[in-house]
Amino acid sequence: MIGSLKSSQPKKGSDLSKASAPLPPAPVIMTCFGHCGIGLGAETYRRLLLDVGADPLKPTIKTSKDEDRVLKRYGSTILRFPQKYGSEEIPLIPRALLIDLDPRAANLILQSYPDLFALREKHVIHGSGGAARNWAEGRTRFTQEMKAKYDIQNQLDALSPEPVRGYTIPFAMGGGTGSSFASSFIEFIKTNSSDPTTVATFGLLPEFGWDPVIFESATINIVMNLEYQVKYSDCSILFSNKVLRELAHKNEKKIQKIPSIIDDLPKEHEVGWKDYKGMNLIAANSIAMFIASFARETEWDMSNYRTWLTTKRPKFAIPWVIPVIPEENQWGKELLGGKNNTMEGIMEKVGKKEDGLLFDIDENDIRSHGGEKDSCCFLVKVKGEFDLKEREALKRVVKDKFNIQDSRMIFVKIPIMEGEPANVTILVNTKAIGPKILEIASEAEESWTAYKDEYGKWGLSTEEFKKGLMDVVHQFS
């Protein structure tokens, strides 16, 4: 049986209490909801494991050198370190939970990566079938099936006996399970925790006419999910599948050369996953940068995002990544070229238009609807100089697109590891995203009359829907 730590500090005399190992920050748990959330979360976790020097297929400690490397990179933020129990090889436990009503996605990942998810069933919560693309059904079944069948708090405690610093939560917003379960979970965390836990959500808006969603019900699902994010999420980051797909297609040749969690799935199960490989790789890169901004040795904490966004309207951010796709030999021992991990390399990517906003936003909306209080947060991982000249260069990049004042720009410098390429992710908070969301809200309002009985039998009344709709319209107007 794998042992557990009862506090964030290792026991006296244990192998982990080395003078060279810093006191790690409190853990962060990734909870992935629905088919989309599980795929994106698994890809992000693979990236994070590489970040801290662990094998993404089988994270273990074999030697004291392995231990030092992972600890110095704050691997305990995303990995649970069990005590030794006889074997020379100690599995490192990902602090990740895969949750879905349909058991297929979570079980496929679990079966395909038995050496990654060492706690087996403790990494998975699933029901007996999907939520029929119905947010109200998913919310009701979260209570009836998930809370009744599983003690969710015990599952979280198994992944992190230590006090939890925060939760990162990827999911799709247009479907039934991901949208509703993410909503219910963040409500559960915020109403059942006495600790100041920070919740960060990563919601993917569907591409209508491409993704397998039902247009009318999806707009209702998105509105209700957005309302819950407004109420319970401290840092809400939005992606557009349309933009992710376009960027993945544009960078198809590069993506083919980048290893992915999907590469190791059984060939007969690639349908439904392979088409999203590039999209997940692009989004996962920005989520990993978000986590690195507070998991590595920086002057920034996860809770700072709460303070940044709490007074904003809308209190949402969209990611801008430079580059869209990392170098092909990322985390390799020999990084190609001399500029790939410097600011000079970053600016070259911008010049070649190898950067990209990951949200479907119109240039006219940026000019017409951007607000005077728009702001942004630069997450910067580069080697070498990052002083006045480098900051001014990034400011100019942003000002070419958004009217953001210098005083409303935040810079977070992230330590870069050996073998890592440079990376800049800019989280942009702007009123210019309002028109896209308000368009969806308008469609949801028109669709409600036809769907009110179907949603009503699962507990979503017209009064509750209209209140949610009004809250979302107010937030994004």
Model features per residue range: what roles?
Residues I2-S477:
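Terminal, contiguous helix-loop blocks that mediate binding/assembly
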